[in-house]
Amino acid sequence: MSAIQLVNQGRQTFRFDTFGDESFWGGTLMLHQAIEGAKLGGVGPGVSPKAALGVGLKVDVDALPANLIAALNHGKVNLDDPATTLALLQLNAVVGVTGFFNSSGTLQSVGIQCALCHSTVDNSMPDLCAGAIQPNPGTGCIGHRLDGWSNRDLNVGAIISLAPDLSVLANLLSTDQATVRTVLGTWGPGKFDAELVLDGKAFNPQQMTDGAVTGTNIPGATLIPPAFGLGGVNLHTWSGWGSVPHWNAFVANLEMHGKGRFWDPRLNNAAQFPIAAAHGFGDLPHIDPDSDVITSKLQALQFYQLAIPSPQPAAGSFNAAAASRGDALFSGKARCNNCHVEPLWTDAGWNLHTASEICIDDFQANRAPDQRYRTSPIGDLFTHFKGGFYHDGRFATLNDVVDHYNACLSLGLTASEKSDLIQYLLSLTFGPKNSTPQSGQMSSGSNEQ
């Protein structure tokens, strides 16, 4: 298979493959019934397009016929009617979600894809967000796909809570459905707790930053990271669970509930992962290769993720002269380059550090096998401003991040040096470094290839 064929196959998997998980999201949770609503054969009020956009779901404008686009632009489409949502699902236009329909036109089931969390759309139709959501800067509600961008508008907890039957999750967590819904309601936009079904720890009892308590009972959900800029990066996720294909297999099997084979004996550690150990998540039952619809797709999926181009900052989005001064600080006085090594923007090698090294609590680190935090690649920060920075979003702005490291590492940065450093951070993209930071060549573009 050629490289082009691998990219195309991986893109198809990333955007449209449910890995058979509709048997869970529809068959077990009955989420499709909540989407269509009682009037259309389901339960409850149903999910209108406006409600769907309000929880961060996106619509791919390239999947819409021209007459529908024209009607949308003229306000002639009822965005308050769940029937319109079903029509969009029939067009395969809802990013990251596939509807499976009966011959009568009612929903039979629903499944999700990688793109649900790791894609969004551009703001080419900005008026259609009105009354639904204020999207992450540079993105929209209905537009062209932006693969690899973290969907910081997506309220995963709210979406799961729509499901009529959460008994499987309640039983797994040894609690009741009401408690599960309460926990899901704490996540908020742009966050997901992948470890909850492994350890049952829904809240960080005491958040510590620079030696001070900065919060108590903080939700354990972490920010959804981008799925681009992964070339040359060793360990993936906020706490370095493993490589990109390891995490793809982990998520496809254990989080999306697709049909495949997964092996990670570290999950047999009952002291650290009591739920995972009790349910054999570290060694999923062997299945017939013809029934495994995940493993054969991991190669192309990783290949596509590595091929997703680095978005470029919008023209004028940072001060080039200040960024040039910040460049010198980054590799000098500020010592950022000690860990965020150019041009990977993470450590070249085993990219993990203890909580004490970065002056924060170890709650999230202790939920991963190595009990450390990964040095996050910091290219293209402009693509995910919403929700804050660090794994739990504890720092609202880049100013807060720089202030934190200034205190943690006793850097002695002046106000002007901090400002220059931030301008440099705003200029960073993945790939070969320009000799002089440019002020931006283009706004965000589609990853159509």
Description of each model-found segment:
Residues 1-449:
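Periplasmic c-type cytochrome electron-transfer domains
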